[in-house]
């Protein structure tokens, strides 16, 4: 791989195109390594070299000590925070380097290699409080052990339905490079294959362009199922299944036309950086989500305001009479352009129902675990609790006390609820269970 395509005159910054290409090529390597480990349990040391070289690239003189990388495009230079990208690479480099060494030894099983690599110990080095992390991992492990115990369900394995960002994947400042590390993909994939009858990711983002299928390191036709747009679109059996209930055809056409219009303004000098600002540009089944500011407030307010005005102007071009599209200010960080829909508002609970129907499964059977990190994930839990009140479980990340109380009340039993501080707690617990109970 060659990530060093910068000309001498732009060495102080990196182009958007080369920045994304460098990370996307590395993500393809992650997918390849993950797939090989899932299939064979082994990798070679030379397959890990790309992680070291990409990490060195991301830590060169164009990135400051506080992880701000200078990026340029069409005469505009700006900084983006790449702390998540760097941390993911650091963890992968250490983990995969150790995995390659141990898996090269004769007659070393996958479970034993994973144990020797000590993923929980590695991940604990990246937190502020190692003792708290280890305590949470032990509690999460006990919670998951109860979940996968089939002695009370007639041998039926559980369903595991989870949110993505903030739950199974740390938040990233740029959606376009919100890339899943290989260590996460490996333990998720093996845990889902061994201990669940279905492990499904239900995210608000889209499936493609970019979407969860581009950003994950897992094989998209592998042990973990993926959805986008709050479960309105699923990738099942190698094809995209869309649930467009209540969305008029004219609205879908208008969203498509607007997406083309926005692609034009994102190639104009003034607004190029918005492709990498927060949510970027996400085309979902019934809306577009647009990032207008970063969590670190790196975009000048007047530039953000001009961008929003430009979006409004393009909406007016596509839908001059405001028949099909509406602009909503979701937060200081993003706006959404939504299709006027008929009927009830779709939520993640509807996405769960769509999945179960497509799988010809039932929430009433066996145990069901719902994982999330915000109030938008609660409809998934409510749906599962309504269908299976005695066997529903909740695993939630880094949430406030009020939401914790709400979740505990929905489940109805504190023993069937687990609260953790980061996705890596779950990854570490997955690794421990795989090492100890998969032979």
From Swiss-Prot:
Top-level taxon of origin: Eukaryota
Recorded GO CC terms: cytoplasm
Binding-site residues for Mg(2+), renumbered to this chain: 163, 165, 373
Sorted UniProt keywords: Hydrolase, Magnesium, Metal-binding
A Pfam family recorded for this sequence: T6PP_C
Keyword Membrane listed: no
Listed SUPFAM superfamilies: HAD-like
Cofactors that this protein relies on: Mg(2+)
Residues annotated as binding substrate: 282-284
InterPro entries in UniProt: HAD-like_sf (IPR036412), HAD_sf (IPR023214), T6PP_C (IPR049063), T6PP_helical (IPR041064)
Disruption phenotype: Lethal at early larval stage. Mutant larvae show intestinal defects, and a high proportion exhibit gut obstruction (gob). No visible phenotype when gob-1 is down-regulated together with the trehalose phosphate synthases tps-1 and tps-2.
Gene Ontology biological process: carbohydrate derivative catabolic process; dephosphorylation; trehalose biosynthetic process
EC number: 3.1.3.12
Keyword Metal-binding: yes
Cofactor descriptive note: Binds 1 Mg(2+) ion per subunit.
Catalytic activity as recorded in UniProt: alpha,alpha-trehalose 6-phosphate + H2O = alpha,alpha-trehalose + phosphate
Single Gene Ontology MF annotation: metal ion binding
Active site residues according to the UniProt entry: 165 (proton donor/acceptor)
UniProt tissue specificity: Ubiquitously expressed. Strong expression in intestine.
Functional note: Catalyzes the hydrolysis of trehalose 6-phosphate to trehalose and phosphate; prevents the accumulation of toxic levels of trehalose 6-phosphate.
Family: Belongs to the gob-1 trehalose phosphatase family.
Name the UniProt record assigns to this protein: Trehalose-phosphatase
Lineage start: Eukaryota, Metazoa, Ecdysozoa, Nematoda, Chromadorea
UniProt gene name: gob-1
């Amino acid at each position: 791989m060659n990530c060093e395509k910068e000309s001498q005159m732009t060495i102080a910054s990196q182009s958007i195109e080369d920045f994304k290409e460098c990370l996307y090529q590395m993500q393809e390597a992650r997918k390849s390594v993950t797939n090989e480990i899932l299939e064979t349990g082994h990798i070679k040391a030379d397959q890990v070299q790309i992680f070291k070289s990409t990490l060195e690239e991301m830590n060169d003189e164009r990135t400051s000590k506080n992880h701000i990388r200078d990026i340029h495009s069409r005469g505009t230079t700006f900084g983006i925070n790449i702390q998540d990208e760097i941390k993911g690479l650091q963890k992968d480099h250490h983990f995969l380097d150790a995995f390659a060494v141990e898996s090269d030894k004769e007659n070393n099983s996958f479970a034993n290699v994973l144990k020797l690599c000590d993923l929980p110990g590695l991940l604990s080095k990246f937190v502020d409080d190692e003792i708290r992390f280890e305590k949470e991992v032990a509690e999460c492990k006990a919670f998951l052990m109860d979940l996968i115990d089939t002695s009370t369900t007639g041998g039926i394995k559980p369903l595991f339905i989870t949110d993505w960002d903030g739950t199974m994947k740390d938040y990233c400042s740029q959606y376009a490079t919100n890339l899943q590390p290989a260590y996460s993909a490996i333990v998720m994939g093996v845990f889902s294959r061994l201990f669940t009858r279905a492990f499904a990711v239900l995210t608000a983002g889209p499936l493609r362009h970019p979407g969860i299928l581009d950003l994950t390191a897992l094989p998209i036709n592998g042990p973990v199922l993926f959805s986008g747009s709050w479960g309105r679109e699923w990738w099942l059996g190698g094809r995209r299944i869309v649930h467009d209930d209540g969305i008029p055809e004219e609205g879908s056409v208008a969203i498509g036309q607007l997406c083309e219009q926005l692609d034009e303004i994102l190639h104009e000098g003034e607004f190029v950086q918005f492709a990498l600002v927060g949510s970027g540009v996400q085309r979902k089944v019934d809306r577009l989500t647009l990032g207008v500011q970063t969590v670190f407030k790196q975009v000048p307010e007047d530039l953000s305001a001009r961008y929003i005005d430009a979006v409004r102007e393009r909406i007016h071009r596509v839908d001059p009479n405001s028949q099909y599209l509406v602009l909503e200010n979701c937060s200081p960080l993003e706006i959404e352009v939504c299709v006027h829909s008929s009927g009830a508002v779709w939520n993640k609970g509807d996405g769960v129902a769509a999945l179960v129907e497509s799988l010809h499964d039932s929430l009433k059977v066996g145990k069901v675990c719902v994982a999330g990190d915000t109030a938008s994930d609660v409809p998934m839990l409510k749906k599962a609790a309504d269908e299976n009140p005695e066997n529903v479980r909740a695993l939630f990340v880094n949430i406030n006390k009020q939401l914790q109380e709400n979740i505990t009340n929905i489940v109805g039993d504190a023993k069937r609820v687990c609260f953790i501080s980061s996705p890596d707690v779950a990854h570490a617990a997955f690794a421990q269970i795989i090492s100890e109970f998969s032979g």
